[in-house]
């Protein structure tokens, strides 16, 4: 019993170390890319690193190995991740402006109804934003294929989608209640939880707890 507890505790500590190292790597590489060019490649590198950790047999990667995986992916993703991430950021800006205009300047039932629709769209976009980087880390496919697959997951995997939205709300509450969590683990903690939810409940080939893969699909290298 004590031996099993010791092994479980060691693995848990290694996981926390991995999440912490990824958080530091995200901060450093985001600044390395002058923020505007470094953030989205950091998101892609973080999810690829977590995918590698989840698929590892012993899940005992050292900090140096975690950093090396992250840095290598970040360099390779400098162009593609920005081409993918900035249109997503524009969608958020447009949706936020529309929601603000309709919600705070509503004058009738129609305006209130539209603001409600925009709120639902914001939840869908939130789930999409959290899932799409995991899907993108798992498949070496075209952007449109990644977008279509992510949208299909949102509809076809309602439990996974609801867990993602709940995770986002929980992360915001936790950051507000315990700011130290944000300082130590940053975005890497909810990003890891997103990867784990997809790994456990998403049932996508190549990143499935049951380890199923399908022929004809190009998977990302672990």
Q: Where in this protein do the model-derived segments appear?
A:
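Alpha-helical transmembrane segments
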Residues: 111-126
């Amino acid at each position: 019993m004590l031996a099993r507890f010791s092994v479980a505790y060691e693995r848990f500590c290694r996981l926390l170390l991995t999440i912490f190292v990824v958080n530091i790597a995200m901060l450093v590489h985001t600044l390395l890319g002058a923020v505007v060019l470094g953030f989205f490649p950091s998101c892609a590198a973080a999810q690829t690193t977590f995918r590698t950790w989840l698929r590892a047999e012993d899940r005992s990667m050292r900090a140096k190995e975690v950093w090396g995986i992250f840095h290598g992916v970040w360099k390779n993703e400098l162009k593609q991740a920005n081409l993918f991430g900035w249109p997503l950021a524009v969608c958020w800006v447009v949706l936020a402006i529309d929601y603000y205009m309709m919600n705070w300047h509503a004058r009738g039932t129609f305006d209130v109804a539209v603001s409600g629709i925009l709120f639902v769209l914001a939840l869908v976009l939130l789930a999409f934003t959290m899932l799409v980087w995991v899907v993108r880390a798992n498949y070496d496919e075209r952007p449109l294929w990644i977008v279509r697959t992510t949208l299909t997951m949102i509809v076809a995997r309602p439990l996974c989608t609801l867990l993602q939205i709940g995770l986002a709300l929980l992360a915001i509450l936790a950051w507000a209640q315990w700011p130290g969590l944000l300082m130590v683990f940053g975005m890497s903690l909810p990003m890891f939880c997103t990867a784990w939810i997809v790994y456990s409940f998403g049932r996508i080939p190549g990143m499935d707890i049951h380890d199923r893969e399908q022929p004809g699909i190009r998977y990302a290298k672990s």
